[in-house]
């Protein structure tokens, strides 16, 4: 699996309520994203930063999603994002009470 950390600066005037509304507004976009397993919206209002943590099934799908058009969309909506891609070898899933590795994903 691939984890993508996306962060961007947000306007200091954005409140928690407004930011949550913006996140809920875009959430349906991700329901049919190829290869996306999960997306978590994140924020640090104290430092005017928000973003998302994405879990993709593979690097190809992650890179396809974060193409130039997607980066431009995020930039226009908030600000230019910073992206970091990570290989995810092992997951501890306490909901399902499983430990998942690359071998059994």
Question: What kind of region is each of these model predictions?
Answer:
Residues 75-87:
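Conserved short beta-strand edge segments in small beta-sheet-based binding/regulatory domains
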Residues 1-49, 59-67, 84-105:
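Short S/T/G/P-rich N-terminal loop/turn motif that feeds into the first structured element of a domain
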Residues 69-73:
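RNA recognition motif
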């Amino acid at each position: 699996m691939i984890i993508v950390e996306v962060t961007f600066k947000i306007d200091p005037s954005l409140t928690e309520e407004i930011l949550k509304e913006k996140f809920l507004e875009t959430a349906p976009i991700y329901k049919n994203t190829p290869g996306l397993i999960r997306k978590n919206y994140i924020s640090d209002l104290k430092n005017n930063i928000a973003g998302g943590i994405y879990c993709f099934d593979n690097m190809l799908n992650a890179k396809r999603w974060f193409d130039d058009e997607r980066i431009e969309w995020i930039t226009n909506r908030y600000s230019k994002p910073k992206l970091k891609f990570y290989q995810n070898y092992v997951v501890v899933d306490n909901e399902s009470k499983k430990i998942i590795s690359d071998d059994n994903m």
